[in-house]
Amino acid sequence: MLMKRGFTLVEMLVVIASIGILAALLLPALSRAKHSAQRSVCQSNVRQLNFAVHMYADDHGNELRAITNKEAIYVSYKESVLPYLGRTRGQTNDALFACPADDFDCDDPAINTLFSFWSPPPTGKCFYRQATTHFSSYAFNGEAPDSDTTRVAQKIFQSVREPSKLILEGELSGAFGLSAHDRKQPHQFPDARNVMSFVDGHVSYIKIYWNGVAGFDGCPAFYEPPAGYDYKWTEK
């Protein structure tokens, strides 16, 4: 009677090592696929929000909403577009307003201080869980933070000279030099990539210029990028 030969220790070690090598090769690819899928969802969200803002404007003489609450001018546009998205006014958490990559730690002092102009500043995880960000990962380019410089609020679409460059709305993180899709330390860094939409309706995953000044005063939304960047915050 023939006896079945089992694996030797060396053979088992070779198999285990092979599995480990395969896992090491596959994990980065799986991670890239996950991040790509998250970015695709985010781009879809931003595209739908851009379309809803256009629908709102169509019903209001092609004029973008005027917002009197300057502290919330970037996020309170959500109430205006909800009816155009089949949502009810007053809804808070909604997947359409949540970037799946948005898991920022708002308790991190480096991030918390960026929102010092909000009272109270956000705490805990994610922008889309915060009342101060109107339960959204996204923001309307209505007005510069802590400033009287109007962006697209109250603008008539036809009056915009470069609609393919003027940001309409997109990821809130972009205004502060952060990126949910390409994390680095420190949190603010040059060319942080964000999903942004424009007045002409297109959506792009773009690099946001940062001047290197850390903290709230260095937020990219305070200044225009130099040549080489295909976006702008204002029309001067």
Where does each model-flagged region fall?
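Juxtamembrane interface helices immediately C-terminal to a transmembrane segment
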Residues: 25, 34-45
